[in-house]
């Protein structure tokens, strides 16, 4: 069985690169077009698999070309799809515009109308053998049911907290490893500063591990009431799409390999940086040995706010 079971978004991305962001109501020729799969949970699982740990996706896909591609891509990267059900309707998909001039990305997405997985899709059998349950806040009812069962089974629950979806606060108390973006942390808590938000998340939800991500600034571990910053690795970024999702998957993979929280953040930061040097949210994710080689030849930088 897989070491990590994931429940959350698995999307089909149409990726287009441009030399400048288009002005509204104009036409602009793309430099490149690529078709790929994405979504926070799915991309995190691909990262885990590419880094040498076993992963499985529990969810649904549409019976359209988007859904077929999502399932096929997961299987290509050795993510188990035994518990993926094909449902009538359109799979979630997005158009991602990447500005190669400044490496920004703009995403327009459609959730699709294929039925989502529900609590009834989660059983002890589906979670058996897992060490981690990885969620991203999508398919919330299913994720909550799975997290409750995971707690009973001694499975660690990790969360890529990027979207402050309605009723997300019902999932947060069940999370052991909480890694939100600073935007999520501030929005959920209503705090003015990221540090205040971290303290409030800890007070409310008591995660065992709390790491706040801050994009190009890196981020910090919130430990004993203070921040411990982790390094970033400056690179020539050409595609940041999926970088955050890669960080989350790499963090879980590092923990499975026995790394400390600080070591896991450093490893995840390096993995994310390498991903940014190539196109593709999932295709661009490096392998384990490549990350180790990168760490041996590159010094990280601590960015202070």
What are these regions (language model features)?
Residues 114-123, 141, 159-167:
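Active-site glycine-rich loop that binds ribose-phosphate moieties when present
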Residues 1-5, 195-305:
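Conserved phosphate-binding/catalytic region of the ribokinase-like
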Residues 147, 151-158, 162-229:
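Conserved phosphate/ATP/ADP-binding segment of small-molecule kinases
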Residues 1-60, 65-69, 76, 237, ...:
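Glycine-rich phosphate/adenosyl-contacting loop at the front of the ribokinase-like
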């Amino acid at each position: 069985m897989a070491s990590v079971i994931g429940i959350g978004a698995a999307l089909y991305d149409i990726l287009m690169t441009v030399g400048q962001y288009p002005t509204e109501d104009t036409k602009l020729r793309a430099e490149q077009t690529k078709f790929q799969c994405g979504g926070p949970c799915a991309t995190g699982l691909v990262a885990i698999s590419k880094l040498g740990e076993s992963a499985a996706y529990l969810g649904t896909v549409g019976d359209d070309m988007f859904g077929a591609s999502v399932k096929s891509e997961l299987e290509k990267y050795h993510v188990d799809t035994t518990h993926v059900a094909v449902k009538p309707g359109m799979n979630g998909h997005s158009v991602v515009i990447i500005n190669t001039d400044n490496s920004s990305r703009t995403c327009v997405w459609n959730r699709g109308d294929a039925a989502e997985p529900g609590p009834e899709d989660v059983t002890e059998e589906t979670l058996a053998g897992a060490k981690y349950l990885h969620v991203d806040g999508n398919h919330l009812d299913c994720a909550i049911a799975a997290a409750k069962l995971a707690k009973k089974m001694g499975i660690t629950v990790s969360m890529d907290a990027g979207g402050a979806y309605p009723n997300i606060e019902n999932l947060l108390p069940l999370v052991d490893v909480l890694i939100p973006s600073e935007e999520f942390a501030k929005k959920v808590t209503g705090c003015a500063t990221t540090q205040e938000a971290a303290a409030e998340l800890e007070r409310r939800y008591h995660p065992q591990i709390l790491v706040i991500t801050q994009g190009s600034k890196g981020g910090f571990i919130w430990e004993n009431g203070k921040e411990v910053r982790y390094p970033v690795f400056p690179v020539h970024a050409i595609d940041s799409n999926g970088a955050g999702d890669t960080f989350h998957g790499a963090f879980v993979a590092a923990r499975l390999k026995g790394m400390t929280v600080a070591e896991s953040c450093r490893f995840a930061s390096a993995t994310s940086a390498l991903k940014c040097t190539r196109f593709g949210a999932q295709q661009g994710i490096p392998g384990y040995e490549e990350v180790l080689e990168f760490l041996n030849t590159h010094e990280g930088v601590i960015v202070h706010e």
